[in-house]
Amino acid sequence: MQTSPLLTQLMEALRCLPGVGPKSAQRMAFTLLQRDRSGGMRLAQALTRAMSEIGHCADCRTFTEQEVCNICSNPRRQENGQICVVESPADIHAIEQTGQYSGRYFVLMGHLSPLDGIGPDDIGLDRLEQRLEAESITEVILATNPTVEGEATANYIAELCAQYGVDASRIAHGVPVGGELEMVDGTTLSHSLAGRHKITF
């Protein structure tokens, strides 16, 4: 079937989004054109501005349209002395939603992966080391993903922290709230048993 070249181009562009295949892209394109052209225009404008104006924070490397993001420039966050190391800006958003953390962040934009040729400098660990040396950091919280690469990255950073006399801690991994033990994989259950804590009254 021959379709409009612009329509084909729109569908191909939508496929760059994660989880969007040919059918989903087609449905999105037709929905925007048939029912919500004003929404499509708003999307186009927001996307154009975001792509041209959003860069990386000079301190933590998260996404921001300023030189330094709002979290890093917050005096109360600076006084906290904690830095939470995460793999992506999306992780910051997830942690902020808990309301349980009041320090600053450092975004790796990935993890160590020697097989893929990704070393310490490729994920900004040289910049993190500069911060450990120059700033009054009391604790680095390692919130990398619980994967083989994430664990290796956390261990590498923990060793780096030790060189500068900075405490390093790892976020806990274990059984999810509301989960059933029989459905939990062995590795997660092992982490849960190893990280158990005493109940006091």
UniProtKB/Swiss-Prot annotation:
- On the tree of life, the source organism's domain of life is Bacteria
- Protein name listed in UniProt: Recombination protein RecR
UniProt GO molecular function: DNA binding; zinc ion binding
Which sequence ranges are marked TM in the entry? none
The record ties this protein, via InterPro entries, to: DNA_Rcmb_RecR (IPR000093), Rcmb_RecR (IPR023627), Rcmb_RecR_Znf (IPR015967), TOPRIM_dom (IPR006171), TOPRIM_RecR (IPR034137)
Q: Which PANTHER family match?
A: RECOMBINATION PROTEIN RECR
Keywords assigned by UniProt? DNA damage, DNA recombination, DNA repair, Metal-binding, Zinc, Zinc-finger
* PROSITE patterns reported in the protein's UniProt record: RECR, TOPRIM
Originating species:
Klebsiella pneumoniae (strain 342)
Cross-referenced SMART domains: TOPRIM (SM00493)
SUPFAM superfamilies reported in the protein's UniProt record: Recombination protein RecR
